[in-house]
Swiss-Prot record:
It catalyses: UDP-N-acetyl-alpha-D-muramate + L-alanine + ATP = UDP-N-acetyl-alpha-D-muramoyl-L-alanine + ADP + phosphate + H(+). NCBIfam families: murC (TIGR01082). It is an enzyme of class 6 (ligase). Its EC number is 6.3.2.8. PANTHER family: UDP-N-ACETYLMURAMATE--L-ALANINE LIGASE, UDP-N-ACETYLMURAMATE--L-ALANINE LIGASE-RELATED. It comes from Salmonella newport (strain SL254). Cell wall formation. This is UDP-N-acetylmuramate--L-alanine ligase. Keywords: ATP-binding, Cell cycle, Cell division, Cell shape, Cell wall biogenesis/degradation, Cytoplasm, Ligase, Nucleotide-binding, Peptidoglycan synthesis. It is found in: Cytoplasm. Belongs to the MurCDEF family. Pathway: Cell wall biogenesis; peptidoglycan biosynthesis. Its main location: cytoplasm.
Length: 491
C-alpha cells in the first residue's frame, strides 16, 4: 500500500489519521518484524526495540525504521501505539512508560487484525505446519498474479522476507495460538492444520480449553467464510461437528474433500495426486519433502481451489516452491576428507521443529528421501516445560536416528526443572539400548564432537527452535571442519 492507498484507508477509517508512529517492543522476532515491515511499507513511522541486531532488524532499518538495542522508557516517546510480543513481560520499562503516558499497548495479533480488517484475510492456524502452509498459500496466490500481502512467522525463501506488502485485497497470515491472541483475527478463510497439546500454560493445562479456543477462532469467520481443516487429525475430526461454518476437509483419509493419494518421495520432492470433489485430479510435484508437507500443500490447494485459481498456477507454484527458513533447510553438502579423513560427504539440513510430532515428521522425511544415509541429529530441546511435559515422546522419537548429539535445553526464559534437562533425556534414551546419545554441553565443541560420528554417507539434521540455528549456519560456514580454537560467539 503506497501513500495514496494509506490516505484512502485513513479516509475510510478517519481515526487512523491519529496513528502516525508505531513502536514495537521485541521487534526482532519474525512475527513482530513481519507486521512492522508491512506497516513501514504502508507509510507509517516505525520504531522498535530488541536486545541484539538480526536479519529482521537489518531489513527494517533498510526501510527507514528506527531500532533501539535496549529497553528504555524514552524509546516510546511520541508513539501513537505500542505493539508487544507475548515474550515481553508487563514490567518491561517501555510498556510501563507507555501505560504512564496513556499510550495504547496492544498485542501483535491485534495489530495483525487491523491489517486484516479491510482485506480478504486468510489465516493459517494449528500446532504444526503453519509457517510452511502460509508460504505455500502465498506462493500460489503470487503465481496466479493476485499480488497478496503476507505476514509469516518464518522466512519465505522465494521472497527473501518474512512479510510482503501486496496491492490486492488478499492478506495471508500465520495465526499464532501460543498465547490465544489469534482470537483477535477475523479472517474470511481459516486453515487449521492440526491440534495438539502445546503451550498448555496459556490454557491452564486444560486441553478442552485449547480445543474450545480453536472453535472460537473458527467462529470468528463470517457465516459465508470457510474453515479448511485436516481430517487426518483425530482432534479436528472430533471437533468438526462443533464447527458452525462451511468446511472443507483435506488429508490422506478416504472421506477428505481434498484427498492425497499415491504419495511417494524422491529425494527432496514429493509426488502425489490430489483428488477434489467435482474437480479434475491434480498430479502434484511438490518441492518439499515429507508426507506432512503433502498435507500442507493439500490445505493450500483447498483454499486456492475455493478462490478459483487456475490449476496450472497451483501446480507451478508447488513444483517451484522454495520453502521457508529453517524448515528442512538444505545448507550444503560437504566433503569429509578435511573433517575426519574419510571419503564421501555429509549433507547438512537445518530444521526448526521442536515438538516430538515435528521432529518425527522431519526424521521420516529424511528416511524417505535418503534411505541409505547415516542419519545424524544435533538436537536442542526448547523450554524445560515442554521437555517435562513431552519427555517420553521425545525419548521415543529421538531413538529413530542413527546418531544423536544433544545440546543443553534452550530455556527461553524458563527456570530449570529437575529431571527435564538434556542430561536426563540422554540417560533415558541410552537406557533404552538403541543409540548412545552424546551430550554437548559446550556449543563451541559441536564440530569437534560431530566429526567422529560421520561415516562419509551422512545426513545431518540440526534440530530445534532455540539458538541452534546459529550453530547450523556456523557448521555450514566452516564446512563441518573442527576448528583449532572454535569461537563461542556462534552459540
Amino acid at each position: 500500500m503506497n501513500t495514496q492507498q494509506l490516505a484512502k484507508l485513513r479516509s475510510i477509517v478517519p481515526e487512523m489519521r491519529r496513528v502516525r508512529h508505531i513502536h514495537f517492543v521485541g521487534i526482532g522476532g519474525a512475527g513482530m518484524g513481519g507486521i512492522a515491515e508491512v506497516l513501514a511499507n504502508e507509510g507509517y513511522q516505525i520504531s522498535g526495540s530488541d536486545l541484539a541486531p538480526n536479519p529482521v532488524t537489518q531489513q527494517l532499518t533498510s526501510l527507514g525504521a528506527t531500532i533501539f538495542f535496549n529497553h528504555r522508557p524514552e524509546n516510546v516517546r511520541d508513539a501513537s501505539v505500542v505493539v508487544v510480543s507475548s515474550a515481553i513481560s508487563a514490567d518491561n520499562p517501555e510498556i510501563v512508560a507507555a501505560h504512564e503516558a496513556r499510550i495504547p499497548v496492544i498485542r501483535r495479533a491485534e495489530m495483525l487484525a487491523e491489517l486484516m480488517r479491510f482485506r480478504h484475510g486468510i489465516a493459517i492456524a494449528g500446532t504444526h505446519g503453519k509457517t510452511t502452509t502460509t508460504a505455500m498459500v502465498s506462493s500460489i496466490y503470487a503465481e496466479a498474479g493476485l499480488d497478496p500481502t503476507f505476514v509469516n512467522g518464518g522466512l519465505v525463501k522465494a521472497a527473501g522476507v518474512h512479510a510482503r506488502l501486496g496491492h490486492s485485497r488478499y492478506l495471508i497470515a500465520e495465526a499464532d495460538e501460543s498465547d490465544a491472541s489469534f482470537l483477535h483475527l477475523q479472517p474470511m478463510v481459516a486453515i487449521v492444520t492440526n491440534i495438539e497439546a502445546d503451550h498448555m500454560d496459556t490454557y491452564h493445562g486444560d486441553f478442552e480449553n485449547l480445543k474450545q479456543t480453536f472453535i472460537n477462532f473458527l467462529h470468528n469467520l463470517p457465516f459465508y467464510g470457510r474453515a479448511v481443516m485436516c481430517v487426518d487429525d483425530p482432534v479436528i475430526r472430533e471437533l468438526l461437528p462443533r464447527v458452525g461454518r462451511q468446511t472443507t476437509t483435506y488429508g490422506f483419509s478416504e472421506d477428505a474433500d481434498v484427498r492425497v493419494e499415491d504419495y511417494q518421495q524422491i529425494g527432496p520432492q514429493g509426488h502425489f495426486t490430489l483428488l477434489r470433489q467435482g474437480m479434475p485430479d491434480l498430479h502434484v510435484t511438490l518441492n518439499a519433502p515429507g508426507r506432512h508437507n503433502a498435507l500442507n500443500a493439500a490445505a493450500a490447494v483447498a483454499v486456492a481451489t475455493e478462490e478459483g485459481i487456475d490449476d496450472d498456477a497451483i501446480l507451478r507454484a508447488l513444483e517451484s516452491f522454495q520453502g521457508t527458513g529453517r524448515r528442512f533447510d538444505f545448507l550444503g553438502e560437504f566433503p569429509l576428507e578435511p573433517v575426519n579423513g574419510k571419503a564421501g560427504t555429509a549433507m547438512l539440513v537445518d530444521d526448526y521443529g521442536h515438538h516430538p510430532t515435528e521432529v518425527d515428521a522431519t526424521i521420516k522425511a529424511a528416511r524417505a528421501g535418503w534411505p541409505d544415509k547415516n542419519l545424524v541429529m544435533l538436537f536442542q530441546p526448547h523450554r524445560y516445560t515442554r521437555t517435562r511435559d513431552l519427555y517420553d515422546d521425545f525419548a521415543n522419537v529421538l531413538t529413530q536416528v542413527d546418531a544423536l548429539l544433544m545440546l543443553d535445553v534452550y530455556p527461553a526464559g524458563e527456570a530449570p526443572i529437575p529431571g527435564a534437562d538434556s542430561r536426563s533425556l540422554c540417560r533415558t534414551i541410552r537406557n533404552r539400548g538403541k543409540i548412545d546419545p552424546i551430550l554437548v554441553s559446550d556449543p563451541a565443541q559441536v564440530a569437534t564432537m560431530l566429526a567422529p560420528v560421520l561415516t562419509g554417507n551422512d545426513l545431518i539434521l540440526v534440530q530445534g527452535a532455540g539458538n541452534v540455528g546459529k550453530i547450523a549456519r556456523y557448521l555450514s560456514e566452516i564446512k563441518l571442519k573442527p576448528q583449532i580454537q572454535e569461537e563461542e560467539q556462534h552459540g
